[in-house]
């Protein structure tokens, strides 16, 4: 064999075993003469040209997770139209959130604490009720950044409350309320979706998540007439629960239908004999949600914030109207999937990879679940008689059991009893429950928005044993938070310098479970070329196999 200059070209071929399980073959051919070095450099620059294609993805980011303490300090004056105080029975503190918004790097929560005092009156010793609102506004800093729509969760429970009668018309209330605020926002980021040119080889991965199209909150009012078997002398409580029964998404709007169930507890005469009356209050609302479409999915919940009963006058005298206010919350989202490059190398050039962590949130479950919580035990006064029972649901939490995430909640039962002195006492008992839903994720990777409400409550005493059964309805949405490593940038630098001499062919003994891409990256060869040379697939190997690794040159 001769070169263009007339000189003989030297050639040789011989095998060489370099490492156990890998055989390589040398094929030596002398370099040709009279080739312009400038043209070689131009060709190398052309081979190193790399095209990078990027796309914008929506990533989830926790921007606030804090706990605050709200003081409960007030002097409640009993109006003249209510009986005087003989004995304080129980004091409740309820959280009512009116508005949540993120602006200028701060999260603002507006609302009030509804302080309700039950007392036994002077004279006829009847059960009475008085209440007062304690407004608050709290601002907290959020994580710096440019954020999209944010989901804000606000919950809380009473840490302690002390209530005493200063005199027959003045009640002093002192306590603290624990407020929990969590916020998860969406941030826009870029990922590499494809690479081309420069002998680049790439491995892609699928990123799945849920993109919030929009969310909206609105205070609504629903009214309905209500009839009582006998005129109430005093209304003691109006416990409300709500449900969204139908949701329809149209262009830029969400049409919702549902109802609010109001349970009115009252007495018709002096004393402590209580009567319960329930009323369903339907509502229809249309909320503007920019970007909402029929192919989107939706989670909606209604949380009652208050209820009033007014009597008729004039021609409507004798007719009563019940009016319920509630916070209607709607979240519209759409499942999304992105393809991102997670690894890459070049068969022609040295590559520099820059990685990044992408956090995604994916809606995994939207549910309405009924659950029963039961508590048993003995009352402090063995002669006490139960006259009524109420219940207060407490915030739910995500816990981990046997490597899975479960939703656990607590509810407090309040038993109103007549003691041996014919006075009214209230005994509290907390009971726990877990929902029969399990998620194959660590608890730290699960985001749960849960809204428990009490459907019914009953209590009975048999001998010395007392039991209370509470039926709750929990509405919620559960999302999984995941983090994946993908490439943020890829650069081809200098031409690839191979340190394997003039090896023309290798034999590699691959094991089951190895990825063809990893094998190809080790030898800077094309995965498709290796698969074609061995008549096999280019993914994960299912069984041990001997592979021929062709030269990349």
What is the predicted function of each stretch?
Residues 6-8:
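Intrinsic disorder/low-complexity segments
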Residues 10-11, 26:
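Intrinsically disordered, low-complexity segments enriched in serine/threonine/proline/glycine
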Residues 22-47:
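Short, Lys/Arg-enriched N-terminal segments with co-localized hydrophobic residues
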Residues 43, 49-502:
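Membrane-lipid interaction segments
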Residues 494-532, 537-553:
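Primarily a LysM-type cell-wall glycan-binding module
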């Amino acid at each position: 064999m001769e070169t263009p200059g007339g000189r003989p070209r030297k050639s040789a071929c011989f095998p060489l075993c370099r490492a156990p399980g890998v055989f390589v073959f040398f094929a030596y051919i002398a370099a040709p003469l009279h080739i312009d070095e400038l043209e070689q450099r131009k060709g190398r620059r052309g081979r190193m040209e790399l095209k990078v294609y990027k796309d914008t993805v929506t990533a989830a980011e926790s921007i606030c997770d804090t706990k605050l303490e709200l003081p409960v300090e007030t002097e409640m004056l009993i109006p003249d139209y209510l009986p005087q105080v003989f004995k304080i029975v129980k004091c409740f503190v309820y959280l009512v959130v009116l508005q949540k918004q993120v602006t200028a790097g701060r999260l603002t929560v507006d609302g009030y604490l509804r302080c309700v005092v039950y007392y036994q009156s002077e004279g006829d010793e009847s059960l009475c009720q008085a209440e007062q609102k304690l407004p608050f506004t709290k601002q907290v800093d959020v994580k710096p950044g440019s954020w999209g729509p944010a989901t804000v969760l606000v919950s809380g429970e009473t840490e302690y409350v002390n209530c005493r009668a200063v005199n027959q018309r003045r009640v002093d209330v002192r306590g603290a309320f624990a407020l929990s605020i969590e916020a998860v926002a969406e941030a826009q980021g870029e990922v590499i979706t494809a690479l081309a040119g420069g002998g680049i080889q790439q491995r892609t991965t699928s990123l799945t998540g849920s993109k919030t199209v929009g969310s909206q909150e609105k205070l609504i009012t629903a009214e309905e007439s209500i009839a009582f078997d006998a005129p109430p002398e005093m209304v003691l409580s109006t416990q409300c629960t709500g449900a969204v029964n139908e949701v329809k998404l149209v262009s830029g709007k969400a049409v919702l239908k549902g109802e609010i169930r109001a349970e009115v507890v009252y007495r018709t005469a002096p004393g402590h004999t209580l009567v319960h009356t329930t009323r369903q209050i339907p509502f229809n609302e249309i909320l503007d949600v920019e970007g909402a479409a029929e192919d989107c999915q939706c989670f909606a919940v209604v949380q009652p914030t208050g209820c009033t009963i007014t009597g008729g006058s004039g021609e409507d005298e004798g007719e009563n109207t019940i009016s319920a206010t509630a916070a209607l919350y709607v979240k519209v989202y759409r499942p999304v999937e992105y393809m991102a490059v997670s690894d890459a190398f070049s068969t022609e050039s040295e590559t520099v990879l820059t990685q990044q962590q992408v956090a995604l949130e994916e809606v995994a479950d939207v549910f309405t679940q009924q659950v029963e919580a039961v508590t048993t035990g003995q009352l402090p006064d063995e002669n006490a008689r139960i006259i009524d029972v109420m219940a207060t649901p407490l915030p739910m939490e995500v816990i981990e059991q046997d490597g899975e995430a479960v939703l656990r909640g607590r509810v407090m039962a309040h038993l109103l009893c007549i003691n041996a002195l014919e006075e009214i006492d209230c005994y509290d008992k907390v009971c726990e429950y877990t929902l029969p839903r399990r998620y194959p994720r660590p608890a730290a990777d699960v985001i749960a928005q849960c809204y428990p409400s009490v459907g019914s409550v009953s209590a009975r005493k048999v001998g010395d044993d007392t039991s209370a059964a509470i039926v709750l309805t929990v509405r919620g949405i559960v999302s999984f938070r995941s983090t994946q490593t993908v490439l943020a940038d890829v650069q081809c630098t200098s031409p690839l310098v191979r340190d394997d001499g003039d090896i023309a062919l290798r034999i590699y003994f691959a094991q089951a479970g190895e990825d063809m891409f990893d094998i190809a990256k080790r030898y800077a060869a094309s995965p498709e070329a290796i698969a074609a040379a061995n008549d096999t697939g280019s993914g994960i190997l299912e069984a041990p196999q001997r592979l021929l690794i062709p030269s990349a040159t």
